[in-house]
């Protein structure tokens, strides 16, 4: 019994450490064009918001509008270089395909529904940088809510 409890404790600790590590990562840092887009926009990794900050919405209250815009421009740069955006326009089908490939989501998965809702919510925005950050923030927040609801189930 002690061994079983120890295994559960270790599993919980590893899961918590993994979630904490992911939330500390910078948004977009896992993608190929991250460094290129930082350079193109004269930013450093220190200028970019963390996943945890964005998924919780803290980036909106902790930073100035110019910082929000710059982060959005880096996101838009990466989306455009990956063929998911052209200017301020999404390629919605390609965005869904890439998201499914990246997350392993299956048809009917709530994450795909969240992506669709986020694209719909932001589709009429004209500023490509603000639009990109809002899309990323919307998806990350939805994923966090879904992860929390799945943990409670």
UniProtKB/Swiss-Prot annotation:
How is this protein organized at the quaternary level? Homodimer.
List GO molecular-function terms, semicolon-separated.
pheromone binding
Q: Where in the cell is it found?
A: Secreted
**Lineage of the species this protein comes from:** Eukaryota, Metazoa, Ecdysozoa, Arthropoda, Hexapoda
Protein name per Swiss-Prot or TrEMBL: Pheromone-binding protein Gp-9
SUPFAM superfamilies linked: Insect pheromone/odorant-binding proteins
Stored CDD domains: PBP_GOBP
InterPro entries reported for this sequence: PBP/GOBP, PBP_GOBP_sf, Pheromone-bd_protein_Gp-9
Record function comment: Colony queen number, a major feature of social organization, is associated with worker genotype for Gp-9. Colonies are headed by either a single reproductive queen (monogyne form) or multiple queens (polygyne form). Differences in worker Gp-9 genotypes between social forms may cause differences in workers' abilities to recognize queens and regulate their numbers.
Signal peptide boundaries: 1-19
Q: Which cysteines are joined by disulfide bonds?
A: 37-77, 73-129, 118-138
**Annotated source species:** Solenopsis n. sp. (strain JP-2002) (Fire ant)
Superkingdom to which the source organism belongs: Eukaryota
């Amino acid at each position: 019994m002690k061994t079983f409890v120890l295994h559960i404790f270790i599993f919980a600790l590893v899961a918590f450490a993994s979630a904490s590590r992911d939330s500390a990562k910078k948004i977009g840092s896992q993608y190929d064009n991250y460094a290129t887009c930082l350079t193109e926009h004269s930013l450093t990794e220190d200028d970019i918001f963390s996943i945890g900050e964005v998924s919780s919405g803290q980036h909106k209250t902790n930073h100035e509008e110019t910082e929000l815009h710059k982060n959005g421009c880096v996101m838009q740069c990466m989306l455009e270089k990956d063929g998911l955006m052209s200017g301020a326009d999404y390629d919605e089908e390609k965005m869904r395909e890439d998201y499914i490939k990246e997350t392993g989501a299956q048809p009917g998965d709530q994450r795909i529904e969240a992506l669709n809702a986020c694209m719909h919510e932001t589709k009429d925005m004209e500023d490509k940088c603000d639009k990109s950050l809002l899309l990323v923030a919307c998806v990350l927040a939805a994923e966090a809510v879904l992860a929390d609801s799945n943990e409670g189930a």
